[in-house]
């Protein structure tokens, strides 16, 4: 059984107040993301994917899909995400809504 068979998934919807807020977060992530991703990986983050939402009137929305080895791995990553919120999101106005669950079905061409 591979790690992706039964991961814990978090889907986060991010809505920014302005293009400037989105740009600020993107710049901060570009600068700081690699160090955080290494720590998240060690704690059980398997992957993440960012997608801009294009079927809405606003261009200020995106979703992020995070896959973790388990619910425990997700919990172990939470202190790191708290740091990320304080550094990467600092100075930006952003509304974050998260949905979490256990994968019931997964398909990939890989």
Positions of PLM-derived features:
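Mature, folded catalytic cores of secreted/periplasmic enzymes
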Residues: 1, 15, 22, 30, ...
């Amino acid at each position: 059984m591979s790690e992706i068979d039964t991961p814990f998934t978090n889907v986060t919807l991010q809505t920014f107040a302005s293009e400037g807020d989105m740009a600020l977060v993107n710049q901060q992530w570009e600068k700081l993301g690699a160090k955080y991703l290494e720590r998240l990986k060690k704690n059980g983050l398997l992957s993440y994917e960012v997608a801009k939402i294009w079927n809405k009137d606003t261009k200020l929305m995106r979703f992020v899909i995070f896959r973790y080895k388990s619910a425990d791995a997700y919990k172990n990553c939470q202190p790191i995400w708290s740091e990320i919120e304080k550094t990467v999101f600092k100075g930006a106005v952003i509304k974050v809504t998260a949905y979490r669950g256990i994968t019931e079905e997964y398909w990939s061409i890989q």
